[in-house]
């Protein structure tokens, strides 16, 4: 009888087993296999680290500021138009534009190229190794015209009941219960400064899933979208930031100035989270309103009140009257003590990584001021009147606005190192192109064809296409262009904002004319006679 032999085998890398062979003379021999535990890879998800991205650094880390400052200011900027809608005559182009206090005023301020600028000191930078840029260190938005509250409204406003005062609720709805209602919108003062347009947000009709059954009259899905704020866009007047032309087909839910418009609200969250911080260096904001009147809407309630929320009534009270409530806003009192304009602001540290550097030699100033929203009424007689007759008098509306922009810019320089140029190209490729810095294309690894007689008609046309002119990426948007290329001056003490800036620095300008102090001459030419002694 032989001893049993044990063999342990390993089948890498997954299975382990144990085999026992018995050899007992003439007795039948059979192997015994004992299956052991089998290792399997984990079925849990493996999370890999995110792909590393380039770190965004502040402009102060690669922009060197100089001690040269310039003042630049605009002329008096005026706008006149109709406060509710644009006026066209004879089906031609617009004769009178829409100018409302509830519109955004977006100024696109164009600055001269400092690299082509006549500098007081030509040794301030090396053009072979450096480039110059502007940094905004101070500004003042001046506003003219008196304080006043302007009204907006709709002669056919959708209101059913005055739900604020006591009234017996009933469901007796006539076909047309629209009324002539006017409101004073939400009071807003706003100023956003950056080198790219400010971003706005509003709600509009969203896309419907293919699996969703939609019938005519259903409430559409909503979608929040972001668009740049343009000059002339309407602000939120108290009825929400939404596309009223798409979402309100009755044309009777809001005042005339926004009934076919889109009201935008600045997307502060998106601009604050901007990686480079170009759209909003800083902002000033003041808003206030209260609900003045309370109405409900006429029309069929699309989503009825659940039956468990009320007890059924009688005498025309079943079903219940309209539960779609709306409040008309009011901007409340306007005072000069809460004004954000007509005062200087100094930029020491921006909220983002861009600390006031004007990339592209431009900056955008987005302004809203409803504290000067007075609408002037103008009346003209159609004929000579001997007594008052309203039928012979035409009434007109006009709104006027007055602005003035003043800035203090600091001259800065950037060293054109390989790291800085790579970073700027990744941030905005147009910057290096504007500085006449080209990047070498990669070396071709494939064989290219080069004809000898490039003007021969025997071969395909080899004429190079003329380079296309550089297109303005913001040409499709509307802005109020303010050209300051000829308005720069180093004589800061000659301008109001410049004197305020010098006072902040603690410096005084030297007198232009030096006056020498001399001893005053005697008023009398004669001298008193000496007394003789006796």
From Swiss-Prot:
Protein location: Virion; Host nucleus
GO molecular function per UniProt: structural molecule activity
Predominant location category: virion
GO CC terms of this entry: host cell nucleus; T=7 icosahedral viral capsid
Record bears the keyword Disulfide bond: yes
Domain of life: Viruses
Region Disordered, residue ranges: 508-534
GO BP terms, alphabetized: endocytosis involved in viral entry into host cell; virion attachment to host cell
InterPro entries: Capsid_L1_Papillomavir, Capsid_L1_sf_Papillomavir, dsDNA_vir_gr_I_capsid
Keywords: Capsid protein, Disulfide bond, Host nucleus, Host-virus interaction, Late protein, T=7 icosahedral capsid protein, Viral attachment to host cell, Viral penetration into host cytoplasm, Virion, Virus endocytosis by host, Virus entry into host cell
This protein's record includes keyword Transit peptide: no
The protein's assembly and partners: Self-assembles into homopentamers. The capsid has an icosahedral symmetry and consists of 72 capsomers, with each capsomer being a pentamer of L1. Interacts with the minor capsid protein L2; this interaction is necessary for viral genome encapsidation. Interacts with protein E2; this interaction enhances E2-dependent replication and transcription activation.
Protein name, UniProt field: Major capsid protein L1
Gene field: L1
